[in-house]
């Protein structure tokens, strides 16, 4: 499907963004729409970039991403995402999709749309939740059953920390988004 020109659509107006910056278009749209649908149209192959939204080493097709205004305003990388790729935004009126994707979006780890492969930038909505220490308490019965050595405890902590790597989170979030949009 060929990429179209980038438009901003709102209940009141429809503007073409070739003459107005995308940030200005978004500010105009935010005042009239409660929920925006973003359709990213990157200009290059993602073999040179990293993104939550698309797998690496593939050319990107149209992709709609539902975000609330509150989520957008909390992300510092949105403006740089907008500059690096074209996007379309329009209000969404499908309440079923809206509620399902709002739940997914609230737990997503965001990246900039275009970040150098060597130094990807990850944005986490609530870092306090992920940076909390992991504690494992074990009881040592008198007969020695269910005893965990210090090596076992350290291995369990390291395994849980490995599960929170940016690469694994990015892959898991991409898969969830693609599955939810496929339904």
UniProtKB/Swiss-Prot annotation:
Q: What Pfam families would the database entry show?
A: Gemini_C4
Q: Which UniProt keywords apply?
A: Host-virus interaction, Inhibition of host innate immune response by virus, Suppressor of RNA silencing, Viral immunoevasion
Query: A single GO BP annotation from the record?
Result: symbiont-mediated suppression of host innate immune response
Q: What domain of life does the native source organism fall in?
A: Viruses
Q: Has UniProt tagged this entry with the keyword rRNA processing? A: no
What is its biological role? Pathogenicity determinant. May act as a suppressor of RNA-mediated gene silencing, also known as post-transcriptional gene silencing (PTGS), a mechanism of plant viral defense that limits the accumulation of viral RNAs.
The similarity annotation says: Belongs to the geminiviridae protein AC4/C4 family.
Q: What is this protein called?
A: Protein AC4
Q: Which organism is it from?
A: African cassava mosaic virus (isolate West Kenyan 844)
Top-level taxonomy: Viruses, Monodnaviria, Shotokuvirae, Cressdnaviricota, Repensiviricetes
